[in-house]
């Protein structure tokens, strides 16, 4: 294993961290950890109009929630602008770049002419070969790109990538307002941070070819690149703006566990044999770029629900309880007392097995914490109405059981006797208990629920059902 691998994640704080960015961060982190290397975080905050402190915090918090820790201090790209400008001027001195005095109007007119002819536009600057400067005239610094040959690199996912230099223009390095462009800033920062490997989406392939021209001009060794296929929707189409707008913080608010998201993202484009459920410790041990596929990954909400259910089931009941209490309290509008929390804790083991997410679990658990009258759905209301005469008998028989005898065996035999005495199917008696105690038919074992809620609370609910007109 290499001990000098350094990867990075370099988000722009113009939006929240989304699935694609989170996967990029995860893959870079895993590759670094697999190789006993370092994973660095750089915030590319040079777009001051769209960047904000709130979005920077949102990205950092999302990474922390996903348990993707970075090494060292966060690098803010905006702090390095003077260094970027210095490099642009160095390229001028070395005749690897030149001043371009063409106006925006001239360039736009040129673009229109190329567009009308259906030709690929590449700015052919008249200033490229002039060796003098003009003071007090608006100018930019452009890279002196080669006009012949090819730019190629060995992509660790796709193999050899070759781009004709005729397709690569003399890119702007420094704007007329003396601000560096993205392409220059990224190259300088990656070099200064000693980045050895960059894993990013295939939408950066053209950027990589252009950045390699800058590396060549500076005579710097470029990092190794691995471009990962983009994420598509369930139908195999490019993600719509609606899908792209779903941030990691929103998945958190929906009640998805970070372990589930990480496992889900890991399997989006990367595989290890036929394993679906993979812990992060296993992922660090197994991660290899050669196991990243070339086909776009697809969103699969069913798989995410499956993984989330798995990790919720593995998590200790007390931990899950503390996660869902705020959701429940927000819904009901008051704080739960210790008795209600006790009911919840007892019932969580069974409820966890059935849930998709924490919000769903909180909603499914509400019957444990509701006061009489509890919420009763339409199906349960119909059963209460149809079996009105049963509830007084249920109440009388169940109230005769002592508190110490309120257990599975006694409750089961009592319900069986009621069924036989009334000549009603035992399943219908259980329906009556579900309707009155839970308020719905879809719930775990009613006997277990009755034991968890205890006798007094169950009798209150049965009594209420008995008196419903």
UniProtKB/Swiss-Prot annotation:
**GO terms under biological process:** glutamyl-tRNA aminoacylation
Q: Which is an annotated Pfam family here?
A: tRNA-synt_1c
Record keywords, A-Z: Aminoacyl-tRNA synthetase, ATP-binding, Cytoplasm, Ligase, Nucleotide-binding, Protein biosynthesis
Q: Does the keyword Endoplasmic reticulum apply?
A: no
What quaternary arrangement does the UniProt entry report? Monomer.
EC code: 6.1.1.17
Q: What role does it play? A: Catalyzes the attachment of glutamate to tRNA(Glu) in a two-step reaction: glutamate is first activated by ATP to form Glu-AMP and then transferred to the acceptor end of tRNA(Glu).
Q: Which domain of life is it from?
A: Bacteria
Q: Which residues bind ATP?
A: 241
Identify the residue span(s) of motif 'KMSKS' region: 238-242
Location relative to the cell = Cytoplasm
Alphabetical list of HAMAP family matching this protein: Glu_tRNA_synth_type1 (MF_00022)
Q: What is its main location?
A: cytoplasm
UniProt protein name: Glutamate--tRNA ligase 2
Q: What class of enzyme is it?
A: ligase
Q: Which family does it belong to?
A: Belongs to the class-I aminoacyl-tRNA synthetase family. Glutamate--tRNA ligase type 1 subfamily.
- Which GO cellular component terms, listed alphabetically, does the Swiss-Prot or TrEMBL entry include? cytosol
* Chain positions of motif 'HIGH' region: 11-21
Catalyzed reaction equations: tRNA(Glu) + L-glutamate + ATP = L-glutamyl-tRNA(Glu) + AMP + diphosphate
| Keyword Transmembrane tagged | no
Q: Which GO terms describe its molecular function?
A: ATP binding; glutamate-tRNA ligase activity; tRNA binding; zinc ion binding
């Amino acid at each position: 294993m290499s001990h000098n691998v350094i990867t990075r994640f370099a988000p722009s704080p113009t939006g929240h961290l989304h699935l694609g960015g989170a996967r990029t961060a995860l893959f870079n982190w895993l590759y670094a950890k697999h190789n006993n290397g370092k994973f660095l975080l750089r915030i590319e905050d040079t777009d001051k109009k769209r960047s904000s402190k709130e979005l920077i915090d949102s990205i950092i918090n999302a990474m922390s929630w996903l348990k993707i820790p970075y090494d060292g201090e966060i690098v803010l790209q905006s702090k390095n602008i003077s260094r970027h400008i210095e490099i642009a001027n160095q390229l001028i001195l070395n005749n690897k770049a030149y001043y371009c005095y063409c106006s925006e109007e001239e360039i736009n007119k040129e673009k229109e002419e190329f567009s009308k002819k259906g030709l690929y536009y590449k700015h052919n600057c008249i200033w490229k070969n002039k060796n003098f400067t003009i003071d007090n005239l608006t100018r930019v610094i452009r890279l002196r790109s080669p006009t012949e040959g090819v730019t190629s690199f060995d992509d660790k996912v796709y193999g050899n990538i070759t781009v004709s230099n005729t397709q690569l223009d003399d890119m702007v390095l420094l704007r007329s307002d003396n601000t560096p462009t993205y392409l220059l800033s990224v190259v300088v920062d990656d070099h200064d941070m000693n980045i050895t490997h960059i894993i990013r989406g295939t939408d950066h392939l053209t950027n990589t070819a252009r950045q390699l021209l800058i590396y060549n001009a500076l005579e710097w060794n470029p990092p190794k690149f691995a471009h990962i296929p983009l994420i598509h929707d369930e139908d195999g189409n490019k993600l719509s703006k609606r899908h792209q707008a779903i941030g990691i913080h929103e998945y958190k608010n929906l009640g998805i566990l970070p372990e589930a998201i990480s496992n889900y993202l890991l399997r989006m484009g990367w595989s290890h044999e036929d394993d679906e459920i993979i812990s992060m410790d296993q992922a660090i041990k197994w991660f290899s770029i050669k196991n990243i596929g070339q086909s776009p990954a697809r969103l699969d909400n069913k798989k995410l629900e499956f993984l989330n259910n798995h990790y919720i089931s593995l998590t200790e009941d007390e931990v899950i309880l503390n996660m869902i209490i705020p959701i429940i309290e927000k819904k009901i509008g008051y704080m739960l007392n210790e008795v209600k929390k006790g009911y919840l804790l007892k019932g969580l083991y069974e409820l966890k097995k059935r849930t998709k997410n924490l919000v769903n679990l909180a909603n499914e658990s509400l019957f444990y914490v509701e006061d009489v009258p509890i919420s009763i759905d339409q199906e349960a209301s119909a059963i209460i109405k149809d079996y009105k005469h049963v509830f007084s008998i249920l109440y009388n028989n169940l109230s005769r059981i002592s508190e110490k005898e309120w257990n599975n065996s006694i409750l089961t035999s009592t319900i069986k006797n009621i069924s036989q005495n009334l000549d009603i199917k035992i399943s219908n008696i259980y329906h009556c208990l579900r309707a009155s105690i839970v308020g719905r038919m879809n719930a775990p074992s009613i006997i277990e629920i009755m034991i968890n809620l205890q006798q007094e609370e169950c009798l209150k609910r049965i009594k209420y059902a008995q008196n419903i007109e």
